[in-house]
């Protein structure tokens, strides 16, 4: 007679000192792997388990696009491939099309919050971590992203391209957040993190200053600051992420640093002025809260 079945509501975590060879055998569970420094961290999660977040329930794991489990061998064990999580995190297999966003409200409604949740669920399907589960884009940042989408759509006259730019921005931000929160950056890279924070803070204050003080706007100054931020991001993730993600970084920063886009955004009598006002209000809030 076989062993009694384990309670599926429990969470089992196994820490292995070294990466296992070949297959990792798990009784009746689907396994996902995460790495922290040189240690392989394997979290075994029942498919019915729900990730808990500070103020409520996050998306259930059963809603994620989980890979099909292999057939159970004669001894009743399930085989799960043991692969490094850093590489899995940067994989985009099974990704939705790059078309316009589709939400419950209809295809013309853009929500950066919804897009961020989709991206996180995709990454969470490859890495099981409570830290990652709690990493949701805050409401203020979400509101800023929504306004950036609107002005990008206004400038490009292309909803599909505007959506793709914001999708790339959110993906890059989440991936960097995962690396940082899971202590994947070396001491040298942490120095780059501090440089990037200072440069981002300088850029944020410049964006607000150019809006609040009329006739001070200089599109070349702001463009150069954004390109400097881009270079620091490339340097930071050089050994962690794939060329595809580096392409996303270029796609995002090259758009927002484009002098023609900046001129449209800061035009005193342009249609984007109300959006710029809300963007700067959000940035000011993040500055006051020491987020930027």
UniProtKB/Swiss-Prot annotation:
GO molecular function: phosphatidylinositol binding; phosphatidylinositol transfer activity
InterPro entries found in the cross-reference section: TNFAIP8-like, TNFAIP8_sf
Any Gene Ontology biological process: regulation of apoptotic process
Region ranges (Disordered): 81-107
Keywords annotated in UniProt: Cell membrane, Cytoplasm, Lipid transport, Membrane, Transport
Xref: Pfam families: DUF758
Protein's cellular compartments: Cytoplasm; Cell membrane
Superkingdom of this protein's organism: Eukaryota
Expression tissues: Widely expressed (at protein level). Highly expressed in most carcinoma cell lines.
Function (record text): Acts as a lipid transfer protein. Preferentially captures and shuttles two lipid second messengers, i.e., phosphatidylinositol 4,5- bisphosphate and phosphatidylinositol 3,4,5-trisphosphate and increases their levels in the plasma membrane. Additionally, may also function as a lipid-presenting protein to enhance the activity of the PI3K-AKT and MEK-ERK pathways. May act as a regulator of tumorigenesis through its activation of phospholipid signaling.
Family affiliation: Belongs to the TNFAIP8 family.
Annotated protein name in UniProt: Tumor necrosis factor alpha-induced protein 8-like protein 3
Gene: TNFAIP8L3
């Amino acid at each position: 007679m076989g062993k009694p079945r384990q309670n599926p509501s429990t969470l089992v975590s196994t820490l292995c000192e070294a990466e296992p060879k070949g297959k990792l055998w798990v009784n009746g569970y689907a396994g996902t792997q995460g790495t922290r420094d040189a240690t392989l961290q394997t979290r075994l999660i029942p498919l019915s388990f729900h990730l808990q977040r500070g103020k409520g329930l996050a998306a259930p794991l059963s809603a994620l696009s989980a890979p099909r489990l292999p057939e159970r061998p004669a001894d009743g064990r399930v085989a799960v491939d043991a692969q490094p999580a850093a590489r899995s995190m940067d994989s985009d297999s099974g990704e939705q099309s790059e078309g316009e966003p589709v939400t419950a409200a209809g295809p013309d409604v853009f929500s950066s919050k919804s897009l961020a949740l989709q991206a996180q669920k995709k990454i969470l399907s490859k890495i099981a971590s409570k830290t990652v589960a709690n990493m949701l884009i805050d409401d203020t940042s979400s509101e800023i992203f929504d306004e950036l989408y609107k002005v990008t759509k206004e400038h490009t006259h292309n909803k599909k391209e505007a959506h793709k730019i914001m999708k790339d921005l959110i993906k890059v931000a989440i991936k960097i957040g995962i690396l940082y929160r899971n202590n994947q950056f070396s001491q040298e890279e942490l120095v780059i993190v501090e440089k990037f924070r200072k440069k981002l803070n300088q850029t944020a204050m410049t964006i607000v200053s150019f809006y609040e003080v009329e006739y001070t706007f200089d599109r070349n100054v702001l463009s150069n600051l954004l390109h400097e931020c881009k270079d620091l991001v490339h340097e930071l993730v050089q050994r962690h992420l794939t060329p595809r993600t580096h392409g996303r970084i270029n796609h995002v920063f090259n758009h927002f640093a484009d002098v023609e886009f900046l001129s449209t955004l800061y035009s005193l009598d342009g249609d984007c002025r109300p959006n710029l006002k809300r963007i700067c209000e959000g940035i000011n809030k993040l500055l006051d809260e020491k987020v930027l």
